[in-house]
Amino acid sequence: MWENGNIDVFSSSSLGALIENRIPAVRIEAFADANETDALITELLEHACRTSSIEQVTRLGISQYEQGVRVSKDNYFKLARHLDPEFAQIYARSFSPVQRLIGRLKKKGFDSAIMSEPGMGDYFAGNGKLRNGYSPVHVDFAPQDSASWAIAKARAQLAWNLYLRVPAKGGELLVWDKQWQPADDRHQVDGNYYYDEAVVRDTRMVRLSVSPGEVIILNSRNYHAVSEVRDRLAFGSFISVFEDTRLRLWS
């Protein structure tokens, strides 16, 4: 459980506390400047492959769950190899948030890289999310839904987002001081990824406002949601945390 409800600045100790679920989130201020975010917005909206799993979100890139778990592992890695050159060009004309974050993590002493799957190659890592609506209460935790994938061996999972375009109202991040357990699945809404709000009833929650150019990292095994918002654009991925302290990024 959390020691407090504070959002800590990025450091090796704060990231360790987040992995251990002792704090709600970590913030990296001024991760990218306005020129960089504007360039990335333009490139993503004009050139990125668009996929969508729910009405409220247009994904600029692919998802291991949607294109992998719900279709096949072969399909996901085939798409990943197809999109790698496309996103390399996007980053060449703007910048790569994924590689910048990996560099920041390495400077803090973490063994960080793109996740790979034995016999399949590297995962796709980093996609945009154009949000029009809200995100209901849910978790993102590979051991819950991806048993046959290497990411299921992680002891913890983080999610990070770089906020590119943030409207004046809405789009707050809600995080609860409760981590998913198998028994919670009785609250999962049939045929959907999200949960009835009863799963977090009477649980401590923090509400985070976000700003363009900053990164928020959370423990994605914790229940979280996003409040109603129009035309918000973010970019990020997951980070699997393994027993040997390796951090591996994937989407």
Language-model features, listed with the residues they occupy:
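Short, Φ-rich (hydrophobic/aromatic) sequence segments
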Residues: I41-L44, W160-Y163, S237-V241
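Generic detector of solvent-exposed, compositionally biased contiguous segments
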Residues: M1-A17, G128-P136, D140, D202-I217, ...
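Residue-level detector of short, conserved catalytic/binding motifs and their immediate flanks
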Residues: P24, A156-L158, L162, E214, ...
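Catalytic core of non-heme Fe(II) oxygenases with the double-stranded beta-helix
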Residues: R131-M205, R248
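N-terminal auxiliary "cap/dimerization" subdomain that precedes the catalytic jelly-roll/cupin core
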Residues: M1-E86, I90-F95
